[in-house]
């Protein structure tokens, strides 16, 4: 079915600034909006906004209030640090709500796609919430946090889940509910990557992401560990700065960050990937059919859950940040790695939500 698109509707795309994952998985959506004659406006804050400004220099961008998401120095205190920051987060969400209301009028916005930004919503225009976490893992408070999240999702016109609703899926309990009370659309895994047949240049690709201070802790640890790696290494620190830097030390080539095109090329040129087990990274690796090793962010239950799930399925091994040594990479040989998936998203059907006449 092909939709007759109304002339150039404006869609606000607003990813959460929590590491780079939410921003990067919005890239294929923003491109699809442009290809389907919509006008996207990007709204976020911090490194997520910086990354999307580099990716789409000609698209209008707006800065939203920061949620003040900080990681505890010790992973065990992660949940309590979040609880301590809750008042700041709630204030930011309320400010965001007010701001979105005025942005809709000022920019003539016709629809919303919010990737986990809880204040980006309007009852007056079609509003989509995108998340892979219908259940929010927080240890012994998982039931409570999941119910709160589902309550928020319920008010949106539709909820897009970047996974399949098949028996074989990537998110497991994170992205699947036992009840059918939310207006869910499983859109399939989202990735900006394409698999290419290119000669292998690197034996190991290290790619870091995620909020501070845990990104820095892992960065420092792995810079020491890769000195003992026998082979060529490319090391992407995941620090988005004004200009890209490249430094070669021994067998390791360091970059502060890469844009999508460079990342795609480097992924394809690398034999093995060492990274966090964030869901956006999982989708990219699955799209490319890569072999990988995971180090979940300490205290982030979602990443720990995904790492355990994928190891149990004999796809990807993992180690904790404290325990990891470079010798652990030898375990990868006995794991299957990701089978490459092809996901042809039906953008016509997805974007029809913005075309429904009231």
Task: List the predicted regions and their residue ranges.
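Conserved nucleotide-sugar phosphate-binding/catalytic loop shared by glycosyltransferases and other
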Residues: 7-10, 17, 35-36, 40-86, ...
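Short amphipathic alpha-helix
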Residues: 23-33, 48
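Donor-nucleotide binding loops and adjacent catalytic segments primarily
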Residues: 30, 188-272, 282, 304, ...
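Conserved nucleotide-sugar donor-binding subdomain of glycosyltransferases
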Residues: 77-119
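Leloir-type glycosyltransferase catalytic cores
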Residues: 84-88, 315-358
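A nucleotide-sugar donor-handling region in carbohydrate enzymes
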Residues: 131, 136-213, 237-241
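Catalytic binding pocket for nucleotide-activated donors in carbohydrate/polymer assembly enzymes
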Residues: 281-282, 286-328
């Amino acid at each position: 079915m092909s939709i007759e698109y109304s002339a150039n509707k404006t869609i606000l795309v607003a990813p959460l600034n929590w590491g780079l994952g939410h921003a990067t998985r919005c890239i294929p959506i923003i491109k699809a909006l442009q290809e389907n004659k919509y006008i996207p406006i990007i709204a976020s804050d911090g490194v997520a906004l910086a990354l999307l400004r580099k990716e789409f220099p000609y698209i209008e961008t707006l800065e939203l209030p920061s949620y003040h998401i900080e990681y505890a120095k010790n992973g065990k205190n992660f949940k309590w640090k979040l609880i301590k920051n809750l008042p700041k987060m709630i204030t930011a969400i309320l400010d965001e709500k007010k701001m979105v209301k005025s942005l809709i009028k000022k920019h003539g916005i016709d629809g919303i796609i919010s990737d986990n930004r809880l204040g980006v919503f309007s009852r007056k225009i079609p509003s989509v919430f995108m998340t892979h976490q219908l259940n929010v893992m927080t240890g012994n408070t998982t039931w409570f946090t999941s119910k709160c999240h589902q309550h928020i999702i319920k008010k949106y016109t539709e909820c897009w889940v970047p996974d399949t609703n098949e028996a074989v899926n990537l998110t497991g309990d994170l992205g699947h509910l036992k009840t059918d009370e939310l207006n869910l659309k499983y859109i399939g895994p989202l990735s900006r990557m394409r698999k290419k047949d290119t000669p292998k240049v690197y034996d190991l690709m290290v790619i870091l992401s995620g909020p501070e201070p845990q990104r820095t802790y892992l960065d420092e640890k792995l810079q020491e560990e890769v000195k003992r790696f026998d082979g060529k290494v490319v090391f992407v620190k995941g620090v988005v700065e004004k200009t890209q830097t490249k430094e070669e030390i021994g067998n390791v080539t360091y970059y502060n960050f890469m844009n999508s095109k460079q990342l795609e090329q480097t992924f394809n040129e690398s034999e093995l990937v060492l990274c966090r087990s964030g869901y956006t990274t999982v989708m990219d690796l699955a799209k490319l059919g890569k072999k990988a090793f995971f180090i979940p962010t300490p205290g982030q239950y979602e990443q720990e859950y995904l790492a355990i799930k994928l190891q149990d399925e004999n796809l990807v091994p993992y180690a904790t940040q404290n325990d990891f040594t470079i010798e652990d990479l030898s375990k990868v040989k006995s794991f299957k790695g990701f089978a490459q998936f092809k996901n042809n998203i039906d953008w016509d059907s997805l974007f029809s939500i913005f075309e429904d006449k009231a």
